């Protein structure tokens, strides 16, 4: 058990331990399994393994080694180390063991699971028949504590609970027993119907995928990919859930493998995905009880090689600010992180302004000076040196803006247009200086101009308004929200067509669309030679006239999301995401017409209802010429020379709607789900509820900003609005040093008033306000 603080070289330790297993223990690479929490982390480990491993093996071959060692090295292929997220390993392991006569398993994205839950999982009928009961049950888990108003909202609220049934290994029979509340019985019946449908159709959601591997391991039917594993190494173990813990224990026991876990309880961020920090804190006892052996450790990695002395001192002080957080950490208390960077002398910077617009403009001035000008010079001369990007290759990609949310627009309320948030103002301010930012999560897919144009062109191609009887989507039983956005997409496409897009390779956009219309409406034309076409072909057929999706990094991420939505339809949609050539175009029962309706209902409607997430991890690296904008969760495991942390641009009043993001008054919805299920998970529930739900909610906020403050290598800057710094402020915010007992560390550390007049602002000595 290795407890690795931020910047302490845990990736290096994992890679060297793998190489030690190969060179010292003579394990073949394919006998070693490493799991990581993100795809990006897996890529980094694989890259280092290849780079360092090949160099070490080449050097070893030049040494006077035994003939047996020489023969061993001749057959070593470092590429065969099994590396990936646990989900990807499960997919590969189960897929490679499939017999030729078995249908392939299809893994569902969360939006597809939500759709199936509504239509095939019994939620639709149960919600209609028991709306009051289910609404009361689900309301504590919604964003605003109100009952879901639509079936889609009910499904999105219920999915995390049903996922937890598997992730937490809940006794669902007891949960839905006759002596439990009626809502419990209804939910357990929905879960049973949903799981049965998935089994009968060879579908798996991600929790079901992991459960399938666990069942194989328990039956000692170890998949071929893992059958010869002799060493298991797990990164970010603090974010493991009970199901994943069971998989690791079963695999280690079945294969008699060595077992190494690396993690940090202070950096656990994924409670909302089922992560259970208590499993890491209690790892030694749980390992002893389950495997009969106590692991070595905990071994502490406390030398920080990433950050300057000032940054390490800042995040060390932050994590110890609230004494109520102490009992939530590994006991006995672990050593304090020590700086080993050898650089420093730049204090923690703080930029606070009256409003987010002014802040965006001033921050853009700062960024431009650092990366496009001669460097940032403090007007008052408080910095020893100017701050400037690397002279050889420095660019905007060396900086990142981190925030709990990176959305650029607030949600619209009561029919009013949405208000711009800080990130939107920053995008515009940077664009005015000919600088760009990379924030694919900042805007909903349905609202992005180029996405609107593409989806509008798609609708005009397969469901044009001149169809006899009008377009299909306008009369379908889909939500008014979906119809609103589809109408908007069509209008955007029509406006785009008026610009007369240039031909591509001698072919016009009008020709491409006309061929799809001929096929979909009448079953004629060049495309009629095929009985059916994948819907993806329509999307990619239109891309040449919208080169934004090919050349812009954000556009590439958006195109992947659209493609994923279309591809997922193959797993659950009536026509598997394909357009069928019509045989009787005028008939409402024609398969061509029905296949178009299936595409509209199962692909375009989820996009219009904003339930498709982007996945920027498809980008092998972030663009060097853009300012990265990430949620703190996304930045886990990454590092940047300059890190700007938004600690409260949204919080200009003490509004109750945003308190859960800064100073919760009640347990988070995730903590309440944990408390709900605790009585039905005897092992996990007792461990988890040693701390109450409100305490756990505060812990999550402290860990979130601890991770943010420990990302920078050279410079950390906090940004926010002035109102939060007023001496008399009631805008309590964990990120600004507020403790759970409502005392304020930043105010305590500021020069104290000597007379009746109070200072206007707090001014903690460890911050340099610019």
Language model features: what each stretch is:
Residues 1-101, 223, 230, 285, ...:
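P-loop NTPase Walker
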Residues 1-9, 33, 41, 82, ...:
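Conserved helicase NTPase motor core
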Residues 1-6, 30, 73-74, 79, ...:
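Inter-lobe coupling/hinge region of RecA-like P-loop helicase motors
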Residues 20, 242-353, 743:
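Conserved RecA-like helicase ATPase core segment
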Residues 81-90, 232-236, 262, 605-660, ...:
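Conserved helicase core region in the C-terminal RecA-like lobe
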Residues 184, 391-398, 402, 506-634, ...:
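Accessory C-terminal helicase-associated subdomains
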Residues 257, 286, 389-553, 560-563:
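ATPase/helicase motor core of nucleic-acid motors
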Residues 491-501, 624-627, 678-740:
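C-terminal accessory regions
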